[in-house]
């Protein structure tokens, strides 16, 4: 929409804070104003609210959409088809983690079991990613420094690349202090000299 005002649906203070600064720099037209409106409900409900009303955009976690459309269970087939069909009606932008880090631990699933259930624990261990556990723990440790809480304007992402773990951190404290960090957390020795910047910084 070639308009100077955008009306965007989002329920996340973190996303609202980041997008207020991100969108004016990266959209191909000048923005005079961005209005954010709160939205509730599951993913299909949110998408339908967006399509059925006069809004310019909606912000949704890519991890949530990926899980729904890639679900192989028969009972989710129609839902997956519906979401794909609605996505095709829209133009989509996947914002870079360097500018819009995720909520700490976003996309990770936690499973609580009894210690004595060895069979179940063994099966869970076989599908557990140790690097993901490390990244989630690092993200949560940083969030604790800010007091924690999902209503804060704080994004923290750690993810693995051929150069090592990348650390992206951005947001605003409860005292109104802005912060931003983008770094290689721990370096790996790169054997292939032809490794591209896209691999190091996806």
Label for each model-derived stretch:
Residues 2-16:
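Short loop->beta-strand "edge-of-pocket" segments that line small-molecule binding or catalytic clefts
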